[in-house]
Amino acid sequence: MYYRNFIITSIEAERILAMKFDEAFAGVKKNVIDTLNQMGNGITRASYYTSCLMDNYQDVCSKLKQEDTRFIAGLAQLVKSRDIIFQMIKIYIETYFQNKKEEKAQYILKKLVGAGVYISSSGLTNRILIMAVATMICQTSRFNTVVYGRINRARSLVLKGSVTATAVVLNVYGLIQDAANSADNLKMHNSFYYNALYANHLEMIYFLIEPVITGVPYLNPMIISDDELAELLIKLMR
């Protein structure tokens, strides 16, 4: 009986050990794949810089240099101020309120309250409503999971995934290329928000909140109805 129990225990221990090994290997594999993909993006971006050697492609060269400069500027703001992510969400909501009269805030608030969102109506203005909604969005678990997950992934790829100076450079360039791709996509699909971020030197760190913004349908701020805006805000706060 003792040996039988010992064998069963040993088999169970080996099974658990194998499962742990598989989990660890899967984690390592994902980190390696992410790092290689990031370095691949870095190599691609570095190859774009060959355009600087050709007279006919100086516009491409100029765009790359501008993206690098603005990425660093955005990153500096992120490091300097803890509320930059909040500001980006606030700017997003502001683009939808720019053509809304002050009395619309009360109507939109009623829609939000009807959906289970509590915001005080005392002295309510568009500005106060924007601040309140932006705060609630930034406090949702989904928002924090997405945004801080992206921040940690970016930091991990640049630091933990880099063992040589070349790897560091390629990972950083890969990160900038990801940021540039996200900014270009935003410019194409939501030029109002892109222009607002650009004016604040924040479009190159938009990639950190991109999944949150693209998780809701795009609606033209110039023609969005009050009901559509309320529904958009409700989706962002869930």
Model-derived segments and spans:
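Terminal export/targeting leaders at protein ends
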Residues: M1-L112
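Long, helix-rich, hydrophobic modules that act as membrane-proximal anchors or helical bundle/coiled-coil regulators
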Residues: M1-L17, K110-T125, A180-N181, H201-M204, ...
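Membrane-engaging insertion elements
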Residues: I8, K29-I72, I151-V216
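An amphipathic alpha-helix signature
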Residues: F86, A105-Q106, I130, A134, ...
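Non-catalytic alpha-helical scaffolds
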Residues: T95-Y96, K100-V117, S121, N171-M188
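Membrane-inserting effector segments that mediate pore formation, membrane fusion
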Residues: G114-A180
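Acidic, carboxylate-rich catalytic segments that either coordinate divalent cations
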Residues: E210, G215-R238
